[in-house]
């Protein structure tokens, strides 16, 4: 009976050793015997961009004589209908419209340091109060007309404020002075 137990134990051990050798490769030292896959790197810039050959057609914003203000500042001045659509968009998003104006400089400028600081041109004067509860975009444009009538030489921007997250979500120039 003792010989029977020992022979079955040896058989079990020999089976486990064959399974182990098939599952794990033998240790060959610290240097790997197989090489890493090598991929050819393409340094052509047109293959990296998603628009291919149109990279050559892109233009640069002219920095002389044209200031970059807010969102959409790279576009020509918005027409009345375009302003109406932008205000309708911010109302659809549930944002509160607000009007702000600046009499001197409608852009970020350097006053207190060599680099623009926290207060350098970022804060404008608010026109009245935020328009909580406004559902009609034409009401916002009427307020815009009032600002322009009161301060024709001012920069005026429309802001969409999210009162739940308490952040400004959109801001764009609605009026620039004729002299600018």
From Swiss-Prot:
A GO CC term attached to the entry: chloroplast
Main location class: plastid
Pfam families: RbcS (PF12338), RuBisCO_small (PF00101)
UniProt key word Lyase: no
Key words of the record: Calvin cycle, Carbon dioxide fixation, Chloroplast, Photorespiration, Photosynthesis, Plastid, Transit peptide
Location of the transit peptide in the chain: 1-56
InterPro entries on file: RuBisCO_ssu (IPR024681), RuBisCO_ssu_dom (IPR000894), RuBisCO_ssu_N (IPR024680), RuBisCO_ssu_sf (IPR036385)
A GO term for molecular function: ribulose-bisphosphate carboxylase activity
Keyword Plastid: yes
Record's subcellular location: Plastid, Chloroplast
One GO process term, biological-process aspect: reductive pentose-phosphate cycle
Record's miscellaneous remark: The basic functional RuBisCO is composed of a large chain homodimer in a 'head-to-tail' conformation. In form I RuBisCO this homodimer is arranged in a barrel-like tetramer with the small subunits forming a tetrameric 'cap' on each end of the 'barrel'.
Assembly mode: Heterohexadecamer of 8 large and 8 small subunits.
Protein family: Belongs to the RuBisCO small chain family.
HAMAP family to which the protein is assigned, alphabetical: RuBisCO_S_bact
Function: RuBisCO catalyzes two reactions: the carboxylation of D-ribulose 1,5-bisphosphate, the primary event in carbon dioxide fixation, as well as the oxidative fragmentation of the pentose substrate. Both reactions occur simultaneously and in competition at the same active site. Although the small subunit is not catalytic it is essential for maximal activity. Binds to abscisic acid (ABA); only half of the possible binding sites are occupied in the crystal; and there are indications this is a low affinity site.
PANTHER family for the chain: RIBULOSE BISPHOSPHATE CARBOXYLASE SMALL CHAIN 1, CHLOROPLASTIC (PTHR31262), RIBULOSE BISPHOSPHATE CARBOXYLASE SMALL SUBUNIT, CHLOROPLASTIC 2 (PTHR31262:SF19)
Name assigned to this protein: Ribulose bisphosphate carboxylase small subunit, chloroplastic 3
Species the sequence originates in: Pisum sativum
Lineage, uppermost ranks: Eukaryota, Viridiplantae, Streptophyta, Embryophyta, Tracheophyta
């Amino acid at each position: 009976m003792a010989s029977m137990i020992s022979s079955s134990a040896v058989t079990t051990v020999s089976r486990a050793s064959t399974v182990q050798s098939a599952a794990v490769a033998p240790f060959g030292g610290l240097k790997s015997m197989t090489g890493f896959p090598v991929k050819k790197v393409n340094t052509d810039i047109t293959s990296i961009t998603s628009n291919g050959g149109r990279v050559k057609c892109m233009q640069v914003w002219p920095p002389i004589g044209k200031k970059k203000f807010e969102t959409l500042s790279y576009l020509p001045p918005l027409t009345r209908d375009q302003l109406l659509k932008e205000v309708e968009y911010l109302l659809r998003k549930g944002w509160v419209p607000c009007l702000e104006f600046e009499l001197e400089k409608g852009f970020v400028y350097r006053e207190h340091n060599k680099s623009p600081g926290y207060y350098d041109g970022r804060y404008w004067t608010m026109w009245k109060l935020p328009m909580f509860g406004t559902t009609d975009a034409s009401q916002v444009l009427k307020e815009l007309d009032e600002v322009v009538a009161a301060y024709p030489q001012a920069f005026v921007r429309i802001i969409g404020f999210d009162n739940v997250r308490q952040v400004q979500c959109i801001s764009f120039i609605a009026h620039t002075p004729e002299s600018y």
